[in-house]
Amino acid sequence: EKLWTPAEARETLADLFPAVDVLFAAERDARTVLGFDGDAEAMASGLAAEFDFETVVITRGEKGALARHGGTTTEQGTFPADTVDPLGSGDAFASGFLAERLDGASIDEALAYGAATAALKRTIEGDMARVSADEVRAIVEDGGGVDIER
């Protein structure tokens, strides 16, 4: 709302959507900016159907994320972490997800790597996730059984 109204944002974004394969949206933005109601699964399904996205990922903060891909919805919880600064966690999630998908991972695996990258980011001051692939992999392989501390 600082730069434009939700209606203006939706109109501008809708013009760009034909070039989008993978859409990431925070649950609140899918509701307020894109105008989709219901739970995250309904939003993801609706967005995928209306705009013909290959994949829609809805992030839900502490409730994790879900992805709609190929007519299937997959959910991922969060990994526990001592939060120092949440700023940039959504971007970190997207980067972890995309890195894995580009490397040939399944949607399930990509969601886990996105969640692990976001968890690691929350342990870092500032808005940039300065983490390694090995750190992310260790969180995923551990299954989130250990609180992440730095």
Q: What is the role of each PLM region?
A:
Residues 1-46, 63-64:
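Conserved beta-alpha-beta core of the PfkB/ribokinase-like small-molecule kinase fold
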Residues 36-150:
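Conserved phosphate-binding/catalytic region of the ribokinase-like
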